[in-house]
């Protein structure tokens, strides 16, 4: 398996920032057994924050086929917490603003949520368990993911909002900027439709 990375940086970016990006990319690829074989780097006034595009190729082994069953009888399982990606980005970029209300310990803890952004491990567990569908929660937040999954399954969904996990740091940042946590960028969170949700939750918990 190999990948190439195209990195576009804002004009004011420093070499140290590019070095940090590449070190993080290498760590992530090493964890997944991926080799970075090439790429491209440029600076542009069109971006205000680094933009990284990854293209990966690999060998086809076997596909994860959807489990047969009635979509009206499925359980919904959500991994980690919603809003992790947005919380991490905002905390890292708006530390001074947030520090007017919150302690630095909370802000920097929120910025470190970036370590939760991979869904590879839970997707692998869900794949082995045999699930009906999986959806990487990102743009549009959990509300967007639920809508897209509902359309894919062709059914309506019954969801208890009180059971959707969200970090307190996310709640605080949402209150500060008047944001809806259910619509936040939520990379690192995987929405799964399974015939036996309790069994899947146990399998996910056993691998934490």
Would you name each region that the model predicts?
Residues 1-208:
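Helix-biased detector of long, well-ordered alpha-helical tracts
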């Amino acid at each position: 398996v190999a990948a190439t990375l195209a990195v576009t940086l804002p004009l004011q970016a420093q070499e140290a920032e590019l070095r940090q990006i590449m070190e993080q990319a290498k760590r992530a690829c090493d964890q997944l057994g991926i080799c970075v074989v090439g790429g491209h780097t440029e600076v542009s006034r069109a971006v205000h924050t680094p933009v990284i595009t990854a293209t990966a190729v690999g060998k086809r082994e076997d596909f994860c086929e959807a489990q047969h069953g009635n979509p009206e009888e499925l359980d919904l399982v959500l991994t980690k917490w919603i809003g992790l990606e947005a919380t991490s980005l905002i905390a890292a970029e708006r530390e001074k603003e947030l520090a007017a209300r919150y302690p630095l310990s909370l802000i920097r803890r929120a910025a470190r949520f970036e370590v939760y952004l991979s869904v590879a491990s839970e997707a692998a567990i869900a794949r082995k368990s045999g699930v009906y569908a999986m959806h990487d929660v990102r743009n549009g937040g959990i509300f967007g993911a639920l809508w897209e999954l509902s359309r894919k399954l062709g059914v309506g969904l019954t969801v208890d909002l009180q059971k959707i996990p969200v970090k307190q740091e996310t709640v605080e940042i949402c209150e500060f900027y008047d944001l809806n946590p259910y619509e936040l960028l939520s990379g690192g969170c995987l929405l799964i439709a399974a015939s036996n949700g309790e069994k899947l939750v146990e399998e996910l918990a056993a691998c934490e």
